[in-house]
């Protein structure tokens, strides 16, 4: 076990070498414990963070994995250590089976062991064996009968053992983690959150527990509540908030602030550098995101983690040469990683070779059918191929994997809109706006949907919400003007059209032309001839000369002549 989250300091007083020593020792302890339990991804994360600390700061810190506090005086821990010593030989045998992926054999070997470490490895082996079997039973992709949350047959046994242990007062953090995993898989998120919070309070640098906690959180409100129940100054609480904000696609200034604080302790952390790139991507600053990802890849040339997101950035920027190079690099590193297949799929999509793109996204899902982005991207490709049925199926499966992914909900809305099923589309756009409340695109799509079903008041509210993201979207302002005109609210319509004209930068756009012609008619109706003439002259002085504007100008001049008679 490790020093608790409550006893660890945050980022205040970073000059204090004792704090850095404590963080370093906890990371070393976590690496040791997770390695013994076969939690390889947690080991990798902790090792990367350890190497992300400033070497200058570490020179004065002695190599030690002994935890701080009165760990050795805990009588329960002393008894636990005694059991581990007694079971060491059989544990090493079981761990060797586990490392060879003989999970059932490992579990069987440990069936009579009593230490928490042995019980964890036995139950974790059972869990992985059950996951493997459920995968084998559902190998066919895009089968309408496929349920991605197919039940792991070992869940009942694992739950029964864990509940008995918790009833007996066993608070081993790794067993708490396993309980959280099982409850999350069974879609009992509130219970999962409770167990995972207890786990991270006891083992704060155990990253796998934080990942599971993030997967159990489906909204920014829930995230805020969970974080408020954890020590706010602890560095792991801050890192978790950054990661969970990205997973929820809810990036705010608080996430950037917490990331900056973490970077003070881990200035060389590649993980944190990647988190900054991901936050920048979520903020839709694609040029900056590209620069950050390029720097990451330069310093870590064999990295594949999150490089699929880098390929998304290059796709949006339509940078075919860089995306093609990235696909070649990824393929040379490991052609059987889901990230590699996704990168290649994005490359073919950018070349408009959508059938090839689908092939690679399917390949990614054959390697990991819970690989969320591939389901969503495959849905996009099916839309391009006009295969709406397959697109809907892909998006639905994406939602099954992760209900907080706004892209899948948005994709469903767009697909049903193509099918002119606007009430269905409305529901999915509403889900997308709930997950992405500050994204102009979501509200614009919702407003358009309300227009299609003849609900102008709701459309106006949606478009106005979209404008909170940017007051300079001329197409939204024109739509608002049209809606107000339909409702006979001409003053509000005029206000929208005037705002539209203010968005104009250099050249006159089709939207501002329409706005000027409408305003000219409006001023003409009020006999404000000079103002009407001014709007029309601005249209005619532009690059586009419209017959409608010319005709209106002739009418205006005729009226002006009669008014002087």
Curated annotation (Swiss-Prot):
<dbReference type="Pfam" id="PF13181">
    <property type="entry name" value="TPR_8"/>
</dbReference>
<dbReference type="Pfam" id="PF04049">
    <property type="entry name" value="ANAPC8"/>
</dbReference>
<dbReference type="InterPro" id="IPR011990">
    <property type="entry name" value="TPR-like_helical_dom_sf"/>
</dbReference>
<dbReference type="Pfam" id="PF13176">
    <property type="entry name" value="TPR_7"/>
</dbReference>
<dbReference type="GO" id="GO:0005634">
    <property type="term" value="C:nucleus"/>
</dbReference>
<comment type="subunit">
    <text>The APC/C is composed of at least 13 subunits: apc1, apc2, nuc2, apc4, apc5, cut9, apc8, apc10, apc11, hcn1, apc13, apc14 and apc15.</text>
</comment>
<feature type="repeat" description="TPR 6">
    <location>
        <begin position="407"/>
        <end position="439"/>
    </location>
</feature>
<comment type="function">
    <text>Component of the anaphase-promoting complex/cyclosome (APC/C), a cell cycle-regulated E3 ubiquitin-protein ligase complex that controls progression through mitosis and the G1 phase of the cell cycle. The APC/C is thought to confer substrate specificity and, in the presence of ubiquitin-conjugating E2 enzymes, it catalyzes the formation of protein-ubiquitin conjugates that are subsequently degraded by the 26S proteasome. Has a role in promoting metaphase to anaphase transition via the ubiquitination of specific mitotic substrates.</text>
</comment>
<keyword id="KW-0833">Ubl conjugation pathway</keyword>
<feature type="repeat" description="TPR 8">
    <location>
        <begin position="475"/>
        <end position="507"/>
    </location>
</feature>
<feature type="repeat" description="TPR 2">
    <location>
        <begin position="173"/>
        <end position="206"/>
    </location>
</feature>
<dbReference type="GO" id="GO:1901970">
    <property type="term" value="P:positive regulation of mitotic sister chromatid separation"/>
</dbReference>
<dbReference type="GO" id="GO:0051301">
    <property type="term" value="P:cell division"/>
</dbReference>
<dbReference type="GO" id="GO:0005680">
    <property type="term" value="C:anaphase-promoting complex"/>
</dbReference>
<feature type="repeat" description="TPR 4">
    <location>
        <begin position="338"/>
        <end position="371"/>
    </location>
</feature>
<dbReference type="GO" id="GO:0045842">
    <property type="term" value="P:positive regulation of mitotic metaphase/anaphase transition"/>
</dbReference>
<keyword id="KW-0802">TPR repeat</keyword>
<feature type="repeat" description="TPR 7">
    <location>
        <begin position="440"/>
        <end position="473"/>
    </location>
</feature>
<keyword id="KW-0132">Cell division</keyword>
<dbReference type="InterPro" id="IPR019734">
    <property type="entry name" value="TPR_rpt"/>
</dbReference>
<feature type="repeat" description="TPR 1">
    <location>
        <begin position="87"/>
        <end position="120"/>
    </location>
</feature>
<dbReference type="GO" id="GO:0044732">
    <property type="term" value="C:mitotic spindle pole body"/>
</dbReference>
<dbReference type="InterPro" id="IPR007192">
    <property type="entry name" value="APC8"/>
</dbReference>
<keyword id="KW-0131">Cell cycle</keyword>
<protein>
    <recommendedName>
        <fullName>Anaphase-promoting complex subunit 8</fullName>
    </recommendedName>
</protein>
<feature type="repeat" description="TPR 3">
    <location>
        <begin position="270"/>
        <end position="303"/>
    </location>
</feature>
<feature type="repeat" description="TPR 5">
    <location>
        <begin position="373"/>
        <end position="405"/>
    </location>
</feature>
<keyword id="KW-0498">Mitosis</keyword>
<dbReference type="GO" id="GO:0031145">
    <property type="term" value="P:anaphase-promoting complex-dependent catabolic process"/>
</dbReference>
<dbReference type="GO" id="GO:0016567">
    <property type="term" value="P:protein ubiquitination"/>
</dbReference>
<keyword id="KW-0677">Repeat</keyword>
């Amino acid at each position: 076990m490790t020093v608790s989250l409550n006893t660890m300091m945050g980022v205040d007083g970073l000059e204090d070498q004792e704090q850095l020593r404590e963080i370093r020792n906890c990371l070393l302890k976590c690496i040791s414990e997770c390695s013994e339990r076969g939690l390889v991804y947690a080991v990798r994360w902790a090792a990367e963070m350890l190497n992300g600390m400033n070497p200058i700061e570490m020179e004065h810190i002695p190599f030690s994995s002994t935890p701080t506090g009165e760990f050795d005086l805990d009588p329960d821990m002393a008894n636990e250590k005694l059991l581990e010593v007694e079971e060491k030989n059989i544990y090493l045998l079981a761990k060797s089976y586990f490392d060879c992926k003989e999970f059932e054999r490992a579990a069987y070997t440990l069936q009579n062991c009593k230490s928490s470490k042995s019980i964890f490895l036995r139950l974790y082996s059972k869990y992985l064996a059950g996951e493997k079997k459920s995968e084998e039973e559902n190998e066919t992709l895009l089968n309408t009968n496929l349920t991605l949350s197919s039940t792991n047959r070992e869940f009942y046994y694992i739950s029964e053992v864990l509940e008995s242990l918790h009833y007996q007062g066993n608070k081993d953090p790794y067993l708490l983690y396993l309980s959280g995993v099982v409850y999350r898989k069974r879609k009992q998120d509130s219970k999962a959150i409770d167990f995972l919070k207890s786990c991270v309070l006891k083992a704060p640098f155990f990253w796998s527990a934080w990942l599971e906690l993030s997967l159990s959180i489906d909204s920014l409100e829930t995230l805020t509540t969970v974080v408020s129940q954890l020590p706010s100054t602890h560095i792991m609480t801050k890192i978790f908030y950054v990661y969970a904000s990205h997973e929820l696609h809810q990036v705010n200034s608080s996430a950037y602030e917490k990331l900056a604080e973490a970077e003070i302790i881990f200035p060389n952390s590649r993980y944190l550098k990647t988190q900054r790139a991901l936050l920048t991507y979520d903020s839709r600053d694609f040029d900056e995101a590209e620069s950050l990802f390029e720097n990451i890849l330069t310093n870590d040339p064999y990295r594949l983690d999150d490089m699929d997101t880098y390929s998304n950035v290059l796709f949006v920027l339509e940078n075919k040469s860089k995306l093609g190079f990235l696909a070649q690099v990824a393929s040379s590193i490991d052609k059987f990683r889901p990230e590699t297949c996704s990168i290649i799929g994005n490359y073919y999509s950018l070349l408009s070779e959508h059938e090839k793109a689908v092939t690679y996204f399917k390949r990614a899902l054959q390697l990991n059918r819970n690989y969320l982005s591939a389901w969503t991207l495959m849905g996009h490709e099916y839309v391009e191929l006009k295969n709406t049925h397959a697109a809907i199926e892909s998006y639905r499966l994406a939602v099954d994997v992760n209900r907080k992914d706004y892209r899948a909900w948005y994709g469903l809305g767009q697909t049903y809109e193509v099918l002119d099923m606007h009430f269905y589309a409305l529901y999915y756009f509403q889900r997308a706006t709930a997950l992405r409340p500050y994204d102009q695109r979501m509200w614009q799509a919702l407003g358009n949907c309300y227009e299609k079903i003849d609900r102008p008041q709701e459309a106006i509210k949606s478009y106005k919400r979209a404008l909170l993201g940017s007051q300079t979207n001329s197409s939204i302002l024109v739509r608002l003007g049209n809606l107000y005109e339909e409702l006979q609210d001409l003053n509000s319509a005029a206000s929208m059209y005037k705002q539209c004209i203010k968005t104009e930068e250099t050249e006159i756009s089709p939207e501002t032309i329409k706005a000027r012609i409408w305003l000219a008619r409006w001023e003409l109706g009020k006999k404000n001839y000079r103002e009407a003439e001014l709007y029309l002259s601005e249209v005619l002085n532009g690059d586009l000369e419209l017959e409608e504007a010319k005709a209106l100008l002739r009418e205006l001049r005729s009226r002006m002549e009669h008014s002087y008679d």
